[in-house]
Regions:
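A compositional/biophysical signature of low hydrophobicity enriched in polar/charged and small residues
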Residues: 1-131
Length: 131
C-alpha cells in the first residue's frame, strides 16, 4: 500500500482503507496477474462469433465455460448472439474448438493479427460532488 500511496499522494493507511472499501462494495472484484499467452505457448488468438441454433442459446455459455481456451465470452446484439475470444497453441486446435460450438450453432471465426489496443484498465473518474 505504501507504493500505491506514494503514487496517489495518500498515506498507506488511507490507501488501505479505500482499497478495502472498494473491495467491500464490489468495485474491486479480484486480483490477477497479466500473463502473455504467447509466453506460455498460446501464440494464436481468434474471435469466434456464434449464432446459436433455435432453442440452443442457453447452451453456448456452457460450451464456452467448459472450453479452457475460451478466455472471454459475451452475449451481444446483432446477427450473432455471442462473441468468444480464444487463445490457441496451433491452428489445428481451432478445429476442435469450433467443433464444440458447432453442436449448438453456426460459427464465424477471425484470427487476431495484432492488438493495437491491448487490454487496459478503465479510466477512474471522480465521484460527482453532492450539492
Amino acid at each position: 500500500m505504501a507504493e500505491l500511496g506514494r503514487r496517489v499522494n495518500l498515506s498507506a493507511p488511507a490507501v488501505g482503507e479505500r482499497v478495502q472499501r472498494m473491495e467491500e462494495t464490489g468495485v474491486i472484484t479480484g486480483y490477477a496477474a497479466q500473463v502473455d499467452p504467447k509466453a506460455i505457448g498460446y501464440p494464436i488468438a481468434a474471435v469466434v462469433r456464434i449464432r446459436p441454433a433455435r432453442r440452443q442459446p442457453h447452451k453456448v455459455p456452457e460450451v464456452a465455460r467448459s472450453t479452457p481456451e475460451v478466455v472471454e465470452c459475451h452475449r451481444v446484439t446483432g446477427e450473432d448472439c455471442y462473441i468468444a475470444k480464444v487463445h490457441l497453441r496451433s491452428m489445428d486446435d481451432l478445429e476442435g474448438i469450433l467443433d464444440r460450438f458447432a453442436v449448438v450453432g453456426q460459427t464465424t471465426t477471425s484470427i487476431v493479427h495484432s492488438a493495437p489496443v491491448p487490454p487496459r484498465p478503465l479510466p477512474l473518474v471522480d465521484e460527482p460532488e453532492e450539492g
